[in-house]
């Protein structure tokens, strides 16, 4: 599925092999100040509006996640959301090190269940997401970082660069 965002509408297109779903395309009127649940990661980094000030809570309409709509076989819908930024910073330890972070939460209510996203975002630029969780059990932590010309490092000899990030190289593809 994909969502194309315009100032007043969001066009959602999906393709499915499930019975009674097939291919679908629909336009949803976009309320002022609304955002997509799928855009919460860039929202937490300050790249998507609205941007709550420190200690502020904002109510917003949030378009349900394309991922969750797909997995639950239900149409996307505008849900009620509460966006909050913590009033101060805290220090967070993850495998990649220790970071001073801001904590942001997004509560999404409605559909087939409410969920809460929590983001620990590096306080200083570039405002990397250091950790994020979702109330359904998703928990992601920054394992490592490297500022590299990665587009040049795609051969077998760069295998150790992958391992240095705490990741395992993918197995070779089979024919």
Where are these regions (language model features)?
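Acidic, serine/threonine-rich low-complexity disordered tracts
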Residues: 1-28, 57-175
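N-terminal trafficking/processing presequences and adjacent post-cleavage segments
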Residues: 31-65
């Amino acid at each position: 599925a994909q969502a194309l965002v315009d100032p007043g509408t969001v066009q959602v297109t999906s393709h499915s092999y499930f019975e009674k779903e097939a291919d679908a395309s629909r336009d949803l009127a976009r309320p002022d100040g609304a955002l997509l649940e799928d855009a919460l990661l860039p929202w937490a980094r300050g790249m998507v509006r609205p941007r709550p000030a420190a200690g502020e809570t904002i109510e917003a309409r949030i378009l349900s996640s394309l991922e969750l709509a797909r997995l639950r076989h239900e149409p996307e819908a505008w849900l009620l959301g509460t966006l909050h930024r913590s009033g101060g910073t805290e220090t967070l330890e993850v495998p990649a090190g220790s970071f001073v972070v801001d904590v942001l939460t997004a509560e999404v209510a409605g559909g087939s269940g409410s969920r809460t996203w929590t983001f620990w975002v590096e306080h200083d630029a570039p405002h990397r997401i250091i950790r994020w969780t979702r109330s359904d059990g998703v928990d992601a932590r920054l394992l490592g970082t490297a500022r590299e010309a990665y587009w040049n490092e795609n051969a077998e000899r760069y295998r150790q660069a992958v391992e240095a990030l705490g990741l395992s190289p993918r197995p070779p593809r089979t024919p």
